[in-house]
Regions:
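Conserved, well-structured interaction surfaces
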Residues: 1-53, 69-82, 87-101
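An aromatic- and glycine-enriched ligand-binding surface/loop that stacks and positions planar moieties
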Residues: 1, 81, 85, 89-90, ...
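Aromatic-lined, polymer-binding surfaces characteristic
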Residues: 46, 55, 59, 100-111
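Proline-centered turn/helix-capping motifs that create local helix->coil transitions or kinks
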Residues: 49-58, 154, 186
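Short coil/linker segments at helix-helix boundaries
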Residues: 55-77, 123-138
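Active-site-proximal beta-strand/loop segments in catalytic clefts of secreted hydrolases
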Residues: 22, 61, 180-182
Length: 189
């Protein structure tokens, strides 16, 4: 399609462009941290594509608009999902675990891994596709790590905590894993 429909790959190109040029950074810790964030977003990008289209081509390097790779066939769902897990594992192992409401952290990557693995495991199970156990096991492992170690808790303050959680003008830091802040005066997120 020429517009809409979710077939836009600009975002992936930006991520792959960053990853192909990040090797220039001499600070290895910073590079690995930001490479982890880039790979988190690539995993999320591909998760959205797989949910919408199923099998799609996997690109993990920067391509030009004339690259013949752009016209190759789709990769298998197994291949794509394994690559998504590779990206998330890298992200989990390299992104800072310092709690930060407005930036991707180790905990954000762990939560995304849990969500993606739950989706893929149940999709495979209820569509009769083999291999669902791997994804459900990965989901359980990631979820257990998150529940046991993440610096988050269920918001229980106030007379109606569930309502207050969603009606507050500020993000409730104890429960929110990743947020976007909206500034009404400037009309920006």
């Amino acid at each position: 399609p020429t517009s809409g429909g979710g077939w836009n790959w600009e975002y992936l190109r930006a991520v792959n462009f960053y990853l192909s040029h990040s090797v220039r950074c001499d600070d290895v810790d910073a590079r690995e941290h930001f490479d982890g964030i880039a790979r988190f977003f690539r995993a999320y990008f591909y998760f959205e594509k797989v949910k919408r289209f199923g099998e799609v081509p996997w690109f993990d390097r920067e391509l030009s608009s004339t690259d013949p790779e752009l016209f190759r066939p789709r990769d298998s769902r197994d291949f794509i999902m394994d690559k998504i897990l590779d990206d998330l594992t890298y992200a989990i192992n390299n992104i800072s675990d310092k709690k930060d409401l407005y930036n991707v952290t180790h905990w954000t990557a762990l939560a995304l891994k849990s969500r993606i693995c739950l989706f893929e495991g149940t999709y495979r199970k209820y569509h009769g596709i083999p291999g669902y156990e791997k994804f459900l096991d990965e989901c359980a492992t990631a979820s257990k790590l998150f529940i046991d170690n993440a610096p988050y808790a269920i918001y229980k303050t106030g007379a109606q905590p569930y309502r207050d959680l969603f009606s507050s003008m500020n993000a409730i830091e104890e429960e929110v894993i990743l947020a976007r802040d909206y500034d009404r005066a400037q009309n920006v997120m």
